[in-house]
């Protein structure tokens, strides 16, 4: 009843003395549909990952949040492929928004809020298999609503075709909704998953988007002079309705297994030794640094009294730091740090093959 009243009040025209709303109103069942979508993604992805691993299974733990909402955390440990992996679902609500949200959307101040999403991080045993992350979410606060999400790949050893396959698959998912989305969401991913204190990206990127509503502004990040902002400004407004943005999250969520499973199947049989394992553990340190220092999802979860175990489930089980480490010149480890932790045009730059070929890092 309350939501219907809000919809009627916000829907008044200027003839009634009130300006029409800037945003399209979400459907009456928006929360239920968003919840069902992300829960469905969690189920589909967990089933696919158990099949991919062949031995490991997810153990589920349900939890409730005293202020409202809850979720279910699923963790796999010591599988055949995955050393540790977690796939979360959460649905939380409250009366007062945390500072991390109000900084971005001050117009949401004073409204009860609702958020639901699924997130996942997988840390494989084999250093030749990349770590991978995804997150798809929906948020409402009074008249304000938006979708956000993305997926990114973090290799420990460089393979050009792995990066290209991951990007190609997510580009196709974005293009199924609108052909201009990937042009902004790819550089936005490079921008977001960037360790400023290290001057490097977390990996080869993928896609990232946030605060997507019917306003049509594709880039709503924090670097107005960056590549993503530039592309967005050049393209201009691309108004997408609630249904299209819902379809975007669903399409990219369902693109995850096709984007990642072929990489796992190709790299899992590759033999590795202590050198590769030690480098993997060292590079995992960058993952920890990003998640604890820069990640807005981690900050939001902690500021809203989320479940700490679920929030920090993304961290790897083992990691190491080494003071002043430098990769051996000309090594594959050096290629990773020189090429695969810098923003690249993975699908359009043919010169990447020339740089990867001497290291056997194409296929």
From Swiss-Prot:
The species this protein was found in: Parasynechococcus marenigrum (strain WH8102)
What is the purpose of this protein?
Involved in the heme and chlorophyll biosynthesis. Catalyzes the aerobic oxidative decarboxylation of propionate groups of rings A and B of coproporphyrinogen-III to yield the vinyl groups in protoporphyrinogen-IX.
One GO CC term on file: cytoplasm
Gene that this polypeptide is encoded by: hemF
* Subcellular location, principal: cytoplasm
Disulfide bond residue pairs = none
Q: Which co-factors does it depend on?
A: a divalent metal cation
Q: What is its EC number?
A: 1.3.3.3
Q: What is this protein called?
A: Oxygen-dependent coproporphyrinogen-III oxidase
BP GO terms, sorted: chlorophyll biosynthetic process; protoporphyrinogen IX biosynthetic process
Question: Which keywords accompany this UniProt record?
Answer: Chlorophyll biosynthesis, Cytoplasm, Heme biosynthesis, Metal-binding, Oxidoreductase, Porphyrin biosynthesis
């Amino acid at each position: 009843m309350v939501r219907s009243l809000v919809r009627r009040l916000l829907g008044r025209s200027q003839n009634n003395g009130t300006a029409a709303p800037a945003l399209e109103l979400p459907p009456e069942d928006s929360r239920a549909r968003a919840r069902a979508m992300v829960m469905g993604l969690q189920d589909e992805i967990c089933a696919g990952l158990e099949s991919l691993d062949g031995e490991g299974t997810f153990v589920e733990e349900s939890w409730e949040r005293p202020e409202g909402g809850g979720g279910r955390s699923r963790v796999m440990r010591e599988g055949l492929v995955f050393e540790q992996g977690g796939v979360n679902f959460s649905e939380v609500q409250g009366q007062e928004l945390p500072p991390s949200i109000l900084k971005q959307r001050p117009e949401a101040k004073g409204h009860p809020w609702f958020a639901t999403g699924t997130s996942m991080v997988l840390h494989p045993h084999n250093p030749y298999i990349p770590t991978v992350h995804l997150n798809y979410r929906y948020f409402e606060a009074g008249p304000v609503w938006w979708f956000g999400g993305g997926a990114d790949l973090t290799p420990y050893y460089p393979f050009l075709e792995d990066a290209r396959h991951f990007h190609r698959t997510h580009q196709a998912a974005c293009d199924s909704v609108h052909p201009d989305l990937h042009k902004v969401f790819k550089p936005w991913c490079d921008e977001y998953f960037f360790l400023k204190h290290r001057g490097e990206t977390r990996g080869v990127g993928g896609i990232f988007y946030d605060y997507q509503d019917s306003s049509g502004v594709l880039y709503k990040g924090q670097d107005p002079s960056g590549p993503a902002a530039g592309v967005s400004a050049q393209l201009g407004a691309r108004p997408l309705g609630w249904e299209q943005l819902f379809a975007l999250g669903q399409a990219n969520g369902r693109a995850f297994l096709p984007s990642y499973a072929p990489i796992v199947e190709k790299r899992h049989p590759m033999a590795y030794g202590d050198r590769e394992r030690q480098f993997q553990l060292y590079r995992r340190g960058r993952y920890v640094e990003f998640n604890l220092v820069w990640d807005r999802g981690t900050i939001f979860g902690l500021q809203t009294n989320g479940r700490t175990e679920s929030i920090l489930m993304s961290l790897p089980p083992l990691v190491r730091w080494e003071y002043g480490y430098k990769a051996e010149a000309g090594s594959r480890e050096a290629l990773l740090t020189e090429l695969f932790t810098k923003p690249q045009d993975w699908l359009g730059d043919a010169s990447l093959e020339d740089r990867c070929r001497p290291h056997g890092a194409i296929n």
